[in-house]
Amino acid sequence: MAYSKIRQPKLSDVIEQQLEFLILEGTLRPGEKLPPERELAKQFDVSRPSLREAIQRLEAKGLLLRRQGGGTFVQSSLWQSFSDPLVELLSDHPESQYDLLETRHALEGIAAYYAALRSTDEDKERIRELHHAIELAQQSGDLDAESNAVLQYQIAVTEAAHNVVLLHLLRCMEPMLAQNVRQNFELLYSRREMLPLVSSHRTRIFEAIMAGKPEEAREASHRHLAFIEEILLDRSREESRRERSLRRLEQRKN
């Protein structure tokens, strides 16, 4: 029987694959600067020439960007997002916000489920910090800070799900999500009695993730977004009634 020779993988190939994995899973984020070459070689316990070769190949693939005298960075355009014209187009058509909410139902429900199932202690600490940041922003009545904290919180939950496709989808949708979250808070701040209810829904998601209860986390996420959707529908109905009343007044004048 003939045996084929086992070929050891080239060290630079192993380093390249490891860096690709760190980028793919989100440990190395778009725009993030890599540690200096000497430090990175020490962390990987490899020679600097092997590391340099791996980095050069990742540059050629468009995953890394080397700046003269400034270090090496993960490409900031790695997660190609929806274009600004598309975001503007969606904002000009309010009915599209319901489509986005339906999409959020699916993505955020799955993210909460797997975050409860897979989150590490570090993930949970990050989620806890952002949940607290949301509470502080709401107490101070800072709409900008609260909407930004909510977006960062959802990104942290999705990262904690440890599903690279899910994270990529969220990154692509980030401009639209930021706008949607902001618009929702503008409405909520005009009906401040709703804010405590929204907070209680979010707290249930948070507690389910922290307790490692995936089904409860997913259900809490669905209830939260269903509540937001109902508030939007109420506003739409109110606006329709107001428009009808104005039309009737105009008809009477004529």
From Swiss-Prot:
Keywords: DNA-binding, Repressor, Transcription, Transcription regulation. It comes from the Bacteria. GO terms for biological process: negative regulation of DNA-templated transcription; positive regulation of DNA-templated transcription. It holds the Pfam family GntR. Residues 9-77 form the HTH gntR-type domain. InterPro entries: GntR_C, TF_FadR/GntR_C, Tscrpt_reg_HTH_GntR, WH-like_DNA-bd_sf, WH_DNA-bd_sf. One of its GO terms (molecular function) is DNA binding. Changing R118C: In ACEC816; constitutively activated. The keyword Transcription regulation applies. Residues 37-56 bind DNA. Transmembrane segments: none annotated. Transcriptional repressor for the pyruvate dehydrogenase complex genes aceEF and lpd. This is Pyruvate dehydrogenase complex repressor. The gene is pdhR.
